[in-house]
A protein has these predicted regions:
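Short glycine-aromatic motifs
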Residues: 15-16, 28, 85-86
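Short A/G/S/P-biased low-complexity tracts
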Residues: 76-85
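Amphipathic alpha-helical segments
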Residues: 2-20
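Acidic, low-complexity, intrinsically disordered interaction modules
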Residues: 19-77
Length: 89
């Protein structure tokens, strides 16, 4: 399991967007990854990878997905670990 080492707001530097509703009020962020249709989710206590579903209550109607981005979700996780933003629990 991966957990954040920094405040969740720092994930905005990597393109994460604050979740909507109660999730956003609790400082949760997400990033949709077109390659592989995954959604990266970070809260103050955990980091998770989910399948990207359009009806997910955490995601805005206009998602923050960069379709021209050639990275996979694993590439992004590797970059977050390398940037010292995530650690293993």
């Amino acid at each position: 399991m991966l957990i954040p080492k920094v405040k969740t707001k720092e994930f905005e530097k990597f393109g994460f967007k604050k979740c909507k509703g109660e999730y956003g009020k609790n400082n949760c962020y997400y990033l949709c990854v077109a390659r592989g249709a995954k959604m990266l989710f970070v809260s103050p206590i955990m980091f998770d990878v989910n399948d990207w579903k359009n009806n997910d209550p955490r995601i805005h109607k206009d998602v923050n997905c960069r379709y021209r981005d050639h990275r996979t979700y694993l590439d992004i996780i590797y970059q977050l670990i390398k940037a010292d933003m995530l650690e293993s629990a």
